[in-house]
Amino acid sequence: MTRFARIIGTGSYLPPKRVTNDELAAQLAEKGIETSDEWIVSRSGIRARHFAEPDVTCSDLAVRAAERAIEAAGIDRSELDLILVATSTPDFVFPSTACLVQQKLGITNGCAAFDVQAVCSGFVYALATADKFIRSGAYRNVLVIGSEVFSRIIDFSDRTTCVLFGDGAGAVVLQASDEPGILSTALHADGSHANILCVPGNVAAGAIQGSAFLYMDGQAVFKLAVTVLDKVAREALAAAELDASQVDWLIPHQANIRIMQGTTKKLGLSNERLIVTVDEHGNTSAASIPLALDVAVRDGRIQRGQHVMLEGVGGGFTWGAALLRF
């Protein structure tokens, strides 16, 4: 009998501090940097984002999202066999954020825990990893989290990037099932594009060598993203023997409304099937897809039995898609 990985619970968390474009523009103006709500919205579709307080860590956000997902799943946290955290902004170089989440959740069953780092594709990469563990029969219940505090690596003197990113976390609980859940996944990377989206600094001998802030070549990312997102979505559809017309909802990485709508158009879908949270969340990297998924589940748009396409593209350069029957 075929064994599937099925989402049985979703959860998300946003820090309370919400910063609108007008508020951010006013803060930047004090530093002599010009921007406006109109400029930001026209280029990205973003109207607001959430920032964590200085003493709040990636694992703190992850735990809040995880608690909500576990509650929605209706299982005891001691039943978890594996914890995966997708993040590019971990609490420490090590231990992993996943291990910290395990500890903060009070889980003492010795379940496996590790991080997945694929930047904005991270949640799709982690979901695919969890899917394979469950299909193999190794694990039954897996917690998958995307959590980020990108406000810690934003250069607030660079208006082309500092207006785009926000903090947050989203999570799902996957469980082994005889009923189809995740139907197919597809993952790819091309390291030759590593320099178009990166944090070029590194730690050596107790000091940061190079820049500790995010760098992005926006035009290069845009051009590559629209191309690979269409291809990887079609790859996942082909693997599941489905057509794009059978997709009920598309949840792409919430980076830029123009990229999202461009992908939707290439797939021949209407914008009514596109789940959009980038306007209120900004780009939350690995957290964006599970955040959007949880919003759409909780507001009733996504229903059991519907086909949902998740897809992401991020630094590395990485990209991937997961097609599921919710």
Swiss-Prot record:
Gene name linked to the record: fabH
Family membership noted in the UniProt record: Belongs to the thiolase-like superfamily. FabH family.
Subunit structure: Homodimer.
Species classification: Bacteria, Pseudomonadati, Pseudomonadota, Betaproteobacteria, Burkholderiales
Protein keywords: Acyltransferase, Cytoplasm, Fatty acid biosynthesis, Fatty acid metabolism, Lipid biosynthesis, Lipid metabolism, Multifunctional enzyme, Transferase
Active site: 120, 253, 283
Pathway noted in the entry: Lipid metabolism; fatty acid biosynthesis
Organism of derivation: Ralstonia pickettii (strain 12J)
Reactions it catalyzes: malonyl-[ACP] + acetyl-CoA + H(+) = 3-oxobutanoyl-[ACP] + CO2 + CoA
Name of the molecule in the record: Beta-ketoacyl-[acyl-carrier-protein] synthase III
Gene Ontology terms for molecular function: 3-oxoacyl-[acyl-carrier-protein] synthase activity; beta-ketoacyl-acyl-carrier-protein synthase III activity
Gene3D superfamilies membership: 3.40.47.10
GO cellular component: cytoplasm
PANTHER family: 3-OXOACYL-[ACYL-CARRIER-PROTEIN] SYNTHASE, BETA-KETOACYL-[ACYL-CARRIER-PROTEIN] SYNTHASE III, CHLOROPLASTIC
Top-rank lineage group of the source organism: Bacteria
Predominant subcellular localization, coarse grouping: cytoplasm
NCBIfam families registered for this protein in UniProt: fabH (TIGR00747), PRK09352.1 (NF006829)
Compartment(s): Cytoplasm
GO biological process: fatty acid biosynthetic process
UniProt keyword Cytoplasm present: yes
Record comment regarding domains: The last Arg residue of the ACP-binding site is essential for the weak association between ACP/AcpP and FabH.
EC number from the UniProt entry: 2.3.1.180
Membrane spanning stretches: none
Stretches for region ACP-binding: 254-258
Role of this protein: Catalyzes the condensation reaction of fatty acid synthesis by the addition to an acyl acceptor of two carbons from malonyl-ACP. Catalyzes the first condensation reaction which initiates fatty acid synthesis and may therefore play a role in governing the total rate of fatty acid production. Possesses both acetoacetyl-ACP synthase and acetyl transacylase activities. Its substrate specificity determines the biosynthesis of branched-chain and/or straight-chain of fatty acids.
